């Protein structure tokens, strides 16, 4: 094994530089940094105050919410664990699966907090490259080489954050079979996957049940109502896992959250009862915004960009010889616009554009992004 193939156990980190940046530096008049759908207003939400409660008997999960999520995911309640958004779901899932020193294989580029949590938990991290030249796909051959008898967990996202690349059902099934042979698990963050809307979506948990047969499902899934539906404030996240593992996660969560916030859980039940309304809202908004994005990308010959089949984000690449940090500074200070610097995804020449905001803001933001690129070219 070469030195570059050896898993790395990084210094234990107790912060997320990306989340710190997002909370303190991403805000601008024209914010193209946010990857989720613009938030649902109080007027748009089907609020029934008669259904709200402040307190309820404790237990492992709010029964009405678990019932709704079982219908939504097509998974039995014994395999569902609720969490405060996908971020906490990822943390809880990884904490339940890993011990300090365990080997994991994690995609690269990756959403920063996934790597941060792995390092915080003391994992030895090997990287699985997802390359621009191959449309950020996963190479099954490279994954097979990366997995060893010591590998405890593989961590992926689908749709991929930051690129929006889609893992097909065939690829998900092949990854599941590989994990079963290696006696490893696969954590897939699917928080963006429901943006496929009417298209068949390769949700990995049922695929895992199919390929596992009598064996335990190798997949652990995390998701929430945040990104697709504009319901971030509810913090309605969940984990799908084999029943025994789900039970372990509930017990571990006693150390983290103990019980859920009942008013938010009741609001989440209301949201799930009217989810088609929020899905239609998202579909309509993204159809208009995708057209704006395509027009912008068609007009630029100075950036390269893989265009994913769905979702709210793309990950363009700046030309060689340009100073990315100077460009992001120019964009923010002169043009009042923010994107996410690629350095937060370990690819500093790239940047992430989010298209889930309101259409007028996106249109104006893309115009300013184009002007900033023109200014960069003239330097």
Regions found by a protein language model. Give the residues of each.
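Helix C-cap/helix->beta junction micro-motif
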Residues: 121, 181-182, 215, 300, ...
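Conserved glycine-rich beta-strand-loop-beta hairpin in the small C-terminal domain of fold type I
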Residues: 269, 285-294, 305-318
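Active-site phosphate-binding strand-loop segment of PLP-dependent enzymes
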Residues: 132-202
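PLP-dependent aminotransferase-like
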Residues: 11, 96-156
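PLP-dependent enzyme catalytic core of the Aspartate aminotransferase-like
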Residues: 145, 329-339, 345-379
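A short helix->loop->beta-strand "cap" motif at the edges of active sites that frequently abuts
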Residues: 102, 123, 181-184, 190, ...
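Conserved core segment of the aminotransferase class I/II
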Residues: 4, 215-287, 294-296, 367, ...
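N-terminal small-domain helix-loop-helix segment of the aminotransferase-like
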Residues: 2-88, 92, 273, 375-379
């Amino acid at each position: 094994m070469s030195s570059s193939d050896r898993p790395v156990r990084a210094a234990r980190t107790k912060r997320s530089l990306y989340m710190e940046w997002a909370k303190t530096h991403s805000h601008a008049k024209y914010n193209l940094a946010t990857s989720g759908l613009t938030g649902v207003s109080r007027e748009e939400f089907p609020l029934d105050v008669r259904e709200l409660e402040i307190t309820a008997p404790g237990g492992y999960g709010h029964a009405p919410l678990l019932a709704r999520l079982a219908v939504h995911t097509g998974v039995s309640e014994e395999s569902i664990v609720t969490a405060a958004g996908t971020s906490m779901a990822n943390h809880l899932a990884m904490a339940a699966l890993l011990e300090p020193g365990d080997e994991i294989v994690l995609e690269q580029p990756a959403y920063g907090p996934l790597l941060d949590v792995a390092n915080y938990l003391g994992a030895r991290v090997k990287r699985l490259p997802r390359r621009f030249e191959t449309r950020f796909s996963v190479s099954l051959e490279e994954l097979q080489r990366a997995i060893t008898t010591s590998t405890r967990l593989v961590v992926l996202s689908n749709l991929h954050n930051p690129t929006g690349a889609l893992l097909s059902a065939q690829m998900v099934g092949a990854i599941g079979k590989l994990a079963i042979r290696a006696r490893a698990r696969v954590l897939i963050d699917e928080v963006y996957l429901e943006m496929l809307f009417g298209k068949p979506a390769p949700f990995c948990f049922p695929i895992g049940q199919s390929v596992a047969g009598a064996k335990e499902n190798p997949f652990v899934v995390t998701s929430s109502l945040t990104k697709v539906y504009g319901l971030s404030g509810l913090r309605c996240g969940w984990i799908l896992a084999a029943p025994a593992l789900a039970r372990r996660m509930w017990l571990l969560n006693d150390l983290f959250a103990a019980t859920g916030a009942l008013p938010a859980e009741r609001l989440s039940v209301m949201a799930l009862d009217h989810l088609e309304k929020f899905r239609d809202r998202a579909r309509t908004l993204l159809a208009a915004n995708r057209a704006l994005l395509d027009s912008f990308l068609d007009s630029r010959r100075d950036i390269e960009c893989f265009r994913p089949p769905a979702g709210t984000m793309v990950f363009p690449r700046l030309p060689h010889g340009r100073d990315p940090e100077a460009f992001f500074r120019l964009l923010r200070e002169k043009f009042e616009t923010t994107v996410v610097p690629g350095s937060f995804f370990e690819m500093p020449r790239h940047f992430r554009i989010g298209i889930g905001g309101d259409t007028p803001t996106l249109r104006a933001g893309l115009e300013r992004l184009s002007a900033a690129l023109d200014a960069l070219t003239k330097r």
